[in-house]
């Protein structure tokens, strides 16, 4: 039995009481009484959660428990925080302080008694409904046990897009042919119901060898139901012209003209994914010339959208899978596993499992998404009884499905089962994804910090960090096909995750059912129903516009998280709304990224939010921070990555619980920050020797990630300070001195024994010897280094390097050589803006695992002769080089690239 969301809250409260037992000394009797009742409550909740769909009264009891647990947490944490602040004031006015202390303790004891009484009443009510105590709790495998099992067998289910395709090979060929060879059409459309595989099919066409060779540039834009014309145009421009920098502030009419002209002059493929209505196309179409080299691949649930965009368009309607194809796909996910070497092996299929599986996939209605989710669920079950339990849960939907609605209900039942089967911590993680707008690329680090701020994930004594644990959670959700993860081999860690819109509907439905979250949009600001629900919700997600002003008094004063998602830089908090901070005293998570504050001042009332664990002001319009920030002593995450110059008072030193701190890039010249007390920091971004002392780093021994700007001649001190950071894995080092001073990079990073990712933007005429670097260094990014000697002979001997980027004058010599046997693990290489480079020799046997190569604006470079030796190469991107005529079919050097599946030319005709 999978544990419920409410049970997780009770478990967290239990842990809080245990963790703070010493500080609650003196009122132990009341605390012990509360813990006893919590123990009884936990045993009842396992049965109550299983019966919540059968009884409204049970659901009401669960909601009561949720509110009681939240109230108890608020009471306990407020008491502990007030006690800490009282002690902090010293011995002045001792008698008065003691009197207040005793009053607070008596009130706290009374409050705890009240909470205990409420829990007793709930327990009595539950028992009257026949809810049973389940003490054993051994009926479900914990996430930790599941992860241990997975680590032992190292299984990876075949859930990539490529392996999910069943019976569509001919369709891919036909669609690719129309895009490349049919000059009478501009638009190729793929239509079909949600979850049927339109995007998966489009992605296969997009990456088809013939398509990649034919077009000069590519853009992929998710449109969805909520979009702005400007945002779609911006995304198209950014993908077709990635080198042209930030265009977020470009006038819409100027952008329209530039994009129109661009599409007139080259062969570009634009994918518009999930266009809902014909009117949506009418809003977007102004940037597309009537007939030029551009083509469009469009996906929609509405078959008429493609015809409306181009009456001559080629339309392809996706079909549902047959029962046989559905089982074949499910089998792939459940029974085909890869070992550590990547070898695919089949697991023997039990006859009873196969019989049940073939019946269960009929509930998926032939939708690949539903089949994949069912497969992900069944892949966690290894015995016939476990499969039987899933079968019984789906059972009522196996018969009598005669209409489309019946089919959809059975499909949503399958998707919902994947949620119900999750361990309680993963339920919270999954529900948290409901905060994000449709098709939003969810930055996983941001997600992990949200979860940590709410106590959903925590670090462990064994050295497991919040990020480590968060990645385990996401891997589990991805294994179940409930999310997709974008993991770029250029980088150490996962960057983004996403949900399919049908899975998101399940997520939103469950979040509403659990009263987990309310989403507030400008378009619904006047909705009475929305206002009523806002008054109950503890979490609030605001999507776009100047919506915070519209919330008014409808927000529940006990809201714990308030997240704002901007679609454009248009949001502004006026002074009249600033009291809203005071009206939300229990906030733990506050994200005001890209918010504009009138007058550039963050209201001092921010200091009243003493429970805050997460505060993001990333790209907010702020010029002055108040000293009241010093009150936020429980902060774990603070992002001050503002736009422009800002005044920062020296109060950050008081936030000693911080795990993540991003400082502003530019502060007033007189700013001096003392940061040595921030001993729990794991990530410190934008640290500058101009505003703080390098010596402060000596105390931050838990740092795993550091970005640092050198503004003075402090390399010796810096080297010794970095040497103390024995846990450092990621280092970004930038030189801002004028004039630039030559460094010996190896001296700086010599003692960083766990370093895996290194970015250097320092003047360094010669690259250090390889023995100065940790052998497990995986990723290196060098720019503006002005290296005069070829760094490749040293870099290629770093045996674990997976990605190398040399850009913007990293190397100023004329010749580079990649020798035989060099770079044995390298997957990605980028050479960009190396203006003096003329010759690059690639010997046979070099870079045997290279998958992607980008050569950008190296104007003097001759076409490398050994590219054809790199047989592993899958993607070659050439930007701003005059090689296209030689490398296209029929060109004199085509043989060098003919076996590379994806060759892309960008701005190569100038």
From Swiss-Prot:
Gene3D superfamilies: 1.20.5.4130, Helical domain of apoptotic protease-activating factors, P-loop containing nucleotide triphosphate hydrolases, Ribonuclease Inhibitor, Winged helix-like DNA-binding domain superfamily/Winged helix DNA-binding domain. Residues 22-60 form a coiled coil. Disulfide bonds: none annotated. It comes from the Eukaryota. Keywords: ATP-binding, Coiled coil, Leucine-rich repeat, Nucleotide-binding, Plant defense, Repeat. Residues 169-461 form the NB-ARC domain. The keyword Membrane does not apply. InterPro entries: Apaf_helical, Disease_R_plants, LRR_dom_sf, LRR_R13L4/SHOC2-like, NB-ARC, P-loop_NTPase, RX-like_CC, Rx_N. Induction: Repressed by silencing mediated by polycomb group (PcG) protein complex containing EMF1 and EMF2. LRR repeats lie at residues 584-609, 610-632, 634-655, 700-725, 726-751, 847-871. GO terms for molecular function: ADP binding; ATP binding. Changing residue 434 to T: Loss of victorin sensitivity. GO terms for biological process: defense response; response to fungus; response to molecule of fungal origin. The keyword Nucleotide-binding applies. Changing residue 511 to T: Loss of victorin sensitivity. Confers susceptibility to the fungus Cochliobolus victoriae by conditioning victorin-dependent (victorin is a toxin synthesized by C.victoriae) induction of defense-associated proteins. The LRR repeats probably act as specificity determinant of pathogen recognition. Belongs to the disease resistance NB-LRR family. RPP8/HRT subfamily. PANTHER family: DISEASE RESISTANCE PROTEIN RP, DISEASE RESISTANCE RPP8-LIKE PROTEIN 3-RELATED. This is Disease susceptibility protein LOV1. It comes from Arabidopsis thaliana.
């Amino acid at each position: 039995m999978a544990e419920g969301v409410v049970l997780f809250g009770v478990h967290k409260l239990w842990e809080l009481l245990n963790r703070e037992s010493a500080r609650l000394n003196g009122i132990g009797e009341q605390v012990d009484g509360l813990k006893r009742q919590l123990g009884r409550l936990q045993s009842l909740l396992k049965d109550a959660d299983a019966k919540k769909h059968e009884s409204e009264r049970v659901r009401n009891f669960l909601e009561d428990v949720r509110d009681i647990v939240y109230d108890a947490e608020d009471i306990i944490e407020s008491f502990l925080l007030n006690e800490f602040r009282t002690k902090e004031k010293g011995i002045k006015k001792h008698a008065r302080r003691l009197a207040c202390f005793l009053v607070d303790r008596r009130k706290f004891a009374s409050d705890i008694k009240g909470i205990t009484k409420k829990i007793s009443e709930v327990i009595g009510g539950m028992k009257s409904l026949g809810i049973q105590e389940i003490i054993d709790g051994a009926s479900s495998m914990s996430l930790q046990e599941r992860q241990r099992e997975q680590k032992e067998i190292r299984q990876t289910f075949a859930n990539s897009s490529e392996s999910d395709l069943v019976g569509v090979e001919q369709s891919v060929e036909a669609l690719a042919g129309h895009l490349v060879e049919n000059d009478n059409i501009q638009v190729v459309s793929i239509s079909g119901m949600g979850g049927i595989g339109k995007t998966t099919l489009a992605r296969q066409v997009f990456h088809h060898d013939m398509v990649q060779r034919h077009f000069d540039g590519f853009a992929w834009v998710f449109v969805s139901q909520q979009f702005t014309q400007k945002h779609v145009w911006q995304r198209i421009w950014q993908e077709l012209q990635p080198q042209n920098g930030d265009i977020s502030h470009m006038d819409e009419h100027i952008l329209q003209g530039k994009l129109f002209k661009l599409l007139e002059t080259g062969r570009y493929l634009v994918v518009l994914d999930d266009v809902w209505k014909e009117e949506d196309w009418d809003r977007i179409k102004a940037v597309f010339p009537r007939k030029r080299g551009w083509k469009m691949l469009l996906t929609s649930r509405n078959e008429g959208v493609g015809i409306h965009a181009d009456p001559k368009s080629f339309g392809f309607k996706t079909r549902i899978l047959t029962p046989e194809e559905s089982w074949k796909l499910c089998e792939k996910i459940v029974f085909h596993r890869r070992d550590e070497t990547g070898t695919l092996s089949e697991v023997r299929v039990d006859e009873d499992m196969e019989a049940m599986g073939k019946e269960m996939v009929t509930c998926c209605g032939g939708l690949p998404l539903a089949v994949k989710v069912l497969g992900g669920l069944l892949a966690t079950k290894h015995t016939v009884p476990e499969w039987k339990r899933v079968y019984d849960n789906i059972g009522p939907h196996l018969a009598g499905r005669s209409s489309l609605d019946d089919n959809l209900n059975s499909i949503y039942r399958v998707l919902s089962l994947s949620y119900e089967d999750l361990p309680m911590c993963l339920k919270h993680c999954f529900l948290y994804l409901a905060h994000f707008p449709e098709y939003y690329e969810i930055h996983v680090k941001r997600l992990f910090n949200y979860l940590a701020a709410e106590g959903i994930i925590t670090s462990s004594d064994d050295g497991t960090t919040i990020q480590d644990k968060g990645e385990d959670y996401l891997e589990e959700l991805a294994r179940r096909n409930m999310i997709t993860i974008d993991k770029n081999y250029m980088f150490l860690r996962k960057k983004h995750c996403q949900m399919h819109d049908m899975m998101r509907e399940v997520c939103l439905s469950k979040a509403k059912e659990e009263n987990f979250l309310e989403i507030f949009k400008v378009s619904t600001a006047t909705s009475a129903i929305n206002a009523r629900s806002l008054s109950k919700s503890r979490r609030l997600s605001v999507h776009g516009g100047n919506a915070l002003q519209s919330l008014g008094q409808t927000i529940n004063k006990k809201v714990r998280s308030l997240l704002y998602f901007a679609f454009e830089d248009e949001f502004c908090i006026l002074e009249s709304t600033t009291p809203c901070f005071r009206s939300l005293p229990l906030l733990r998570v506050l994200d005001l990224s890209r918010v504009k504050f009138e007058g550039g001042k963050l209201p001092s009332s921010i200091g009243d939010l003493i429970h805050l664990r997460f505060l993001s002001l990333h790209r907010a319009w702020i010029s002055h921070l108040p000293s009241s920030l010093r009150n936020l002593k429980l902060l774990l995450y603070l992002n001050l990555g503002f736009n422009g110059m800002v005044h920062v008072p020296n109060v950050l030193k008081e936030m000693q619980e911080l795990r993540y701190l991003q400082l502003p890039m530019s502060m007033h010249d007189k700013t001096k920050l003392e940061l040595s007390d921030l001993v729990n920091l794991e990530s410190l971004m934008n640290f500058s020797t101009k505003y703080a002392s390098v010596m402060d780093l000596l105390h931050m021994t838990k740092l795993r990630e550091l970005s640092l700007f050198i503004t003075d001649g402090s390399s010796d001190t810096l080297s010794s300070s970095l040497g103390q950071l024995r846990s450092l894995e990621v280092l970004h080092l930038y030189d801002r001195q004028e004039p630039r001073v030559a460094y010996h990079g190896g001296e700086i990073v010599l003692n960083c024994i766990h370093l895996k990712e290194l970015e250097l933007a320092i003047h360094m005429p010669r690259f250090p010897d390889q023995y100065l670097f940790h052998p497990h260094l995986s990723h290196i990014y060098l720019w503006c280094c002005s290296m005069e000697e070829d760094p490749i002979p040293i870099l290629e001997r770093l045996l674990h390097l997976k990605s190398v980027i040399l850009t913007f004058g990293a190397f100023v010599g004329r010749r580079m050589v990649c020798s035989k046997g060099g770079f044995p693990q390298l997957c990605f290489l980028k050479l960009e803006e190396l203006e003096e480079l003329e010759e690059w020799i690639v010997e046979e046997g070099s870079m045997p695992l290279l998958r992607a190569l980008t050569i950008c604006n190296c104007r003097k470079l001759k076409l490398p002769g050994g590219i054809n030796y790199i047989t592993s190469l899958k993607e070659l991107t050439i930007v701003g080089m005059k090689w296209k005529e030689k490398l296209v079919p029929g060109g004199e050097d085509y043989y060098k690239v003919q076996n590379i599946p994806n060759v892309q030319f960008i701005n190569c005709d100038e």
